[in-house]
Design a protein with these regions (language model features):
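N-terminal soluble domains immediately following signal/targeting peptides that reside
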Residues: 1-140
């Protein structure tokens, strides 16, 4: 489950993602199978460069047609889940948003990625999967 929230007055989006930690490690291996990932994630703080690389290769957010790059704010374990919070800087107020989510789509054919997008008065819940992994919306 992920959420994308426009933060008023800061020209940024805050993106939160919660997923099972074991699935996260498995999916992370698709971009970095050279490291002992379990050892890397047994230590705090988590390796932010690796999480940034992972998230930016799996979740693509375009505002007004421009691809944004996320930067990790925090990563926390909560039981069997990992919570990731990232920030995306904008240069203009959003008029359109395109989201592509590829998290776990290479592993599970029935994977569904739920996302909530909140920008000003616009709020939309979406389901993305391996065959339908992208949505575009105009913000009014």
């Amino acid at each position: 489950m992920s959420s994308i929230d426009y933060v008023q007055g800061t020209d940024s989006l805050k993106v939160s993602c919660r997923m099972e930690f074991e699935d996260f490690l498995k999916d992370l291996q698709t971009i970095d199978d050279d490291r002992n990932l379990r050892r890397s994630f047994n230590q705090q703080p988590f390796p932010s460069d690796l999480i940034n690389q992972y998230f930016n290769s799996k979740v693509f957010i375009y505002i007004n047609g421009k691809l944004l790059i996320g930067k990790l704010l925090s990563a926390d374990l909560d039981g069997n889940d990992i919570n990731l919070n990232l920030i995306y800087r904008l240069n203009k107020k959003p008029k359109s948003i395109t989201v592509r989510n590829l998290i776990l789509t290479g592993w599970y054919t029935d994977q569904t990625n739920l996302m909530i997008i909140r920008i000003d008065n616009f709020e939309k819940g979406i389901k993305l999967n391996p065959e339908h992994n992208e949505e575009t919306y105009t913000i009014k």
